[in-house]
């Protein structure tokens, strides 16, 4: 699974272990969104991935990934994830600093472009010295609020697989009302970040957002390669 990572994070972290790429940025579930925090804004999130029962492909586990994201100005945000916290078994703690830049935001046409990079720095039970995840994305927001995201990624070896991996990353967001959004994202490929995650995003209060999804592996899904993903985020200002 996602590097138990969460993911590809669990990632990647996202190595995150095994469950989620643990991306130190604003995301849909695992795939980065094209949102960028304004200068001085601070956002914190805790991701929890878990599988309550054993299966052929994936054993019972739980994983927790905290992250913080800060708006740096000039359409740039920076972040930090702490991945590799997995039970049962030894932790493989990994620091994941990240940066996201939005070079284009259409005012009326709904288009946006972002570029991003994550550096993976294992600090405990290290399986490799350092790794990298780089991506480019474009999104289109329609008048009804629907947003579609598509892009490409590259993971260096040992982050989500023993070899370098490249592919596509995609997202879908459909607001139902001011408090509820149906969403899904997907990393292509057969590696620890290769999951499709549908779910819902819901506003708990003016500063708190909840996420509930279910990650389904691109391979061995019929043998149990799937798990729950819960996230809670807080906007400090």
State each model region's role:
Residues 1-28, 237:
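Cleavable N-terminal export/targeting peptides
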Residues 23-158, 172-181, 185-237:
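Transmembrane beta-barrel domains of Gram-negative outer membranes and organellar outer membranes
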Residues 163-170:
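Short loop-to-alpha-helix "cap/lid" segments that border enzyme active sites
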């Amino acid at each position: 699974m996602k590097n138990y990572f969460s993911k590809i994070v669990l990632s990647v972290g996202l190595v995150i272990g095994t469950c989620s790429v643990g991306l130190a940025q604003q995301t849909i579930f695992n795939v980065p969104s094209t949102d960028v925090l304004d200068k001085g804004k601070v956002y914190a999130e805790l991701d929890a991935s878990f599988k309550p029962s054993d299966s052929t492909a994936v054993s019972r586990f739980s994983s927790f990934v905290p992250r913080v994201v800060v708006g740096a100005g000039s359409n740039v945000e920076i972040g930090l994830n702490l991945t590799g916290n997995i039970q049962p078994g030894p932790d493989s703690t990994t620091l994941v600093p990240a940066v996201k830049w939005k070079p284009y935001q259409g005012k009326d046409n709904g288009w946006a472009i972002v570029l991003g990079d994550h550096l993976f720095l294992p600090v405990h039970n290290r399986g490799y010295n350092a790794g990298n995840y780089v991506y480019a994305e474009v999104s289109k927001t329609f008048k009804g609020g629907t947003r579609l995201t598509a892009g490409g990624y590259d993971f260096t070896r040992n982050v989500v697989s023993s070899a370098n991996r490249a592919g596509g990353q995609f997202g879908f967001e459909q607001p139902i009302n001011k408090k509820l959004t149906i969403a899904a994202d997907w990393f292509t490929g057969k590696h620890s970040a290769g999951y499709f995650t549908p779910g819902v995003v819901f506003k708990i209060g003016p500063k708190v957002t909840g996420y509930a999804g279910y990650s389904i592996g691109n391979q061995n899904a019929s043998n149990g390669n799937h798990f729950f993903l819960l996230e809670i985020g807080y906007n400090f200002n």
